[in-house]
From Swiss-Prot:
Official protein name in the record: Transcription elongation regulator 1-like protein
Basic and acidic residues compositional bias, start-end: 306-317, 378-387, 411-421, 428-439
Region (Disordered): 1-30, 281-344, 378-448
Taxonomic source organism: Homo sapiens (Human)
GO cellular component: nucleus
Keywords assigned by UniProt, alphabetized: Repeat
Keyword match rRNA-binding: no
Gene Ontology molecular function terms on file: RNA polymerase binding; transcription coregulator activity
UniProt cross-references to InterPro entries, sorted A to Z: FF_domain, FF_domain_sf, TCRG1-like, WW_dom, WW_dom_sf
Gene3D superfamilies per record: 2.20.70.10, FF domain
Positions with biased composition (Basic residues): 7-23
């Protein structure tokens, strides 16, 4: 009993010694006495976030991260003492009449708030789901006397073109942002919380496992210094765009005014500015961006305001390149191909004498040599000897003999044409245009009947060595570059290939059978010529005649042994018959 009482006393002492957590206080604007100025939020040395319930209207809140230090204070602010900690406005606060003047007359104690770092904390007593979260991100602005809140929590995230910086304490969700007129933080421009005018935009991304909307700070020029007593317009707007799933917070700072600069020294604070462009959480609905859209890592970007002139310029379609498409398309077409022996790759030549490598099994085309073919010595020989040039060289030699006679004929034709043109005179421009059109139009192609095209296609399959025991996809690389391949459409090609395979299986089976019979006969001739005795073994025979061409015609080892054993059995039967005859004769 005494031990239990001691334990209870010790527990109470420890509870009394521990500092109690203070909940953040809410200051309504219509309360008496009036609250402090509605445009200041005291921020700790490192970045954080505040979470408010989604069902609650955004209240006029003033939260201080810690009690303000006694010194140093910013000079020139006699009404409301502001510490030298960096200040950042995060919420739009409706201003009551003469709230700033009343705040100057009534100093307020420092309020205790809690900054959440990178996660949902139950300390504020809010549900984890359906929340609006504010994440202060500090952009690189102009230099100032205020201390920078950058600590070890900043890390740089790099993408191939440039760097961006944000706090590693937060798990920012990925958002799609149109990249035009955007600004990234580069490596030498680490973000600082400095004095300038900023625009705060909240965006709620698509529903995810852990929704965490981001806050983007866009710098804007300062029209003038802000003083100790500021008035904000009485009609602040909290615009919620449900279609874009984004919330925008804005306060118009145009009517900022204060006492004369002779009495108070100007100080640049961070104030809210109107926002017209929210952070987009879905891909931009633009034809150009949809065509060239590439998946990007999660990036934090600063967007500038788009003018109406810029919108009109964006709507104009980009200039299309044209002119030499037909010529380049003709030159880039594949002309010939040869398979590389012992590999799935094929060497393909185009019309402009370029070479690329095609893998039909992987459906992959590569300009550079694949890793499988880099150590091949015969590849250079294949590339230097294209098959389509071999065919062209043969008729070129035949035509070289009759070139002299053709030159003479051409000279005569040119002379006769000159005489005709001199007699007829210059033609009219309309007639010249017609002649040009007539020369440009290609001659009509004569389409062969279907039966002839089918026979040509089958001949191609036979010549190219298409296997009947393979599939269409595997044998496609053998025939795809042949001009006869284009005689039929895709459906007809597959139908004829299936018919060819069915008939070809029977033919190949017969061919294999006939080849095996021929090999068997040649093997028997070898056995007879070798004068094998019934006592010789197959191992001895193979060592002696293994290099003979007739021995190699039978490819399988089992067939060789089978034929050898059959021949040995025949020899043994002959020996038995001969012995029986000799016994009968005796």
């Amino acid at each position: 009993m005494q031990a239990g009482a001691r334990f209870q006393r010790r527990r109470r002492q420890l509870q009394q010694q521990q500092p109690r957590r203070r909940q953040p206080l809410l200051w309504p604007m219509d309360a008496e006495p009036p609250p402090p100025p509605p445009w200041v939020w005291m921020v700790p040395g490192s970045a954080g976030l505040l979470r408010l319930s989604a069902g609650v209207v955004v209240p006029p809140v003033l939260l201080a991260s810690a009690p303000p230090p006694a010194a140093p204070l910013l000079p020139g602010l006699p009404g409301w003492p502001a510490p030298s900690e960096p200040v950042l406005p995060l919420l739009p606060l409706p201003s009551a009449p003469d709230s700033a003047a009343a705040a100057a007359a009534h100093p307020f104690p420092a309020l205790h708030g809690q900054w959440l770092f990178g996660g949902h904390s139950p300390s504020l007593g809010l549900p984890p789901s359906s929340t609006v979260e504010l994440v202060p991100v500090f952009p690189h602005l102009c230099p100032s006397a205020l201390a920078t809140p950058i600590g070890k929590s900043w890390i740089d995230k790099r993408i191939p073109n440039c760097k961006i910086f944000f706090n590693n304490s937060f798990a920012l969700d990925s958002t799609w942002i149109h990249p035009e007129e955007s600004r990234f933080f580069h490596g030498h421009e680490k973000p600082r919380l400095l004095a300038n005018q900023v625009a705060v935009s909240l965006s709620r991304p698509a529903p995810a496992s852990r929704p965490l909307p981001t806050v983007v700070l866009a710098p804007q020029p300062i029209p003038g210094g802000c003083h100790n007593s500021l008035k904000v317009t009485s009609s602040p707007a909290i615009a919620i765009a449900t279609a874009a799933a984004a919330a925008m917070v804005s306060v118009d700072p145009e009517n900022l005014r204060g006492p004369s600069p002779s009495s108070v020294q100007p100080r640049h604070f961070l104030t809210l500015a109107p926002i017209k462009i929210p952070l987009r959480t879905s891909p931009v609905s633009d034809t150009r961006t949809e065509r060239g859209r590439v998946a990007r890592p999660p990036a934090l970007m600063l967007r500038a305001q788009k003018s109406r002139d810029g919108d009109k310029e964006d709507k104009e379609p980009p200039p299309m390149l044209g002119g030499g498409e037909d010529s380049t398309a003709r030159g880039n077409r594949p002309v010939a191909s040869t398979p590389v022996p012992g590999s799935p790759w094929c060497v393909v030549w185009t019309g402009d004498d370029r070479v690329f490598f095609f893998n039909p099994t992987m459906h992959l085309s590569v300009w550079e040599k694949p890793m499988d073919l880099k150590d091949r010595g015969d590849l250079n020989r294949i590339i230097e000897d294209p098959p389509h040039k071999r065919k062209l060289e043969a008729p070129a030699t035949d035509n070289s003999d009759g070139s002299s006679s053709e030159d003479n004929r051409e000279d005569q034709d040119v002379k006769t044409k000159r005489n005709r043109t001199e007699g007829c005179g210059s033609p009219k421009p309309e007639e010249a245009k017609r002649e040009d059109k007539g020369t440009r139009t290609p001659p009509p192609q004569i389409l062969l009947p279907l039966e002839e095209r089918v026979t040509h296609f089958r001949d191609m399959l036979l010549e190219r060595g298409v296997s009947a025991f393979s599939t269409w996809e595997k044998e496609l690389h053998k025939i795809v570059f042949d001009p006869r391949y284009l005689l039929l459409n895709s459906e007809e090609r597959k139908q004829i290939f299936e018919q060819f395979v069915k008939t070809r299986i029977k033919e190949e089976y017969k061919e294999k059978k006939s080849k095996l019979l021929l090999a068997k006969e040649e093997f028997k001739k070898l056995l007879e010529e070798s004068k094998v005795s019934p006592r010789t073994t197959f191992k001895e025979f193979a060592e002696k005649y293994g290099r003979d061409q007739r021995f190699r015609l039978v490819q399988k080892r089992k067939d060789q042994e089978h034929f050898f054993n059959q021949f040995i059995l025949i020899l043994k039967k002959r020996d038995k018959e001969n012995r029986l005859r000799l016994r009968k004769m005796r």
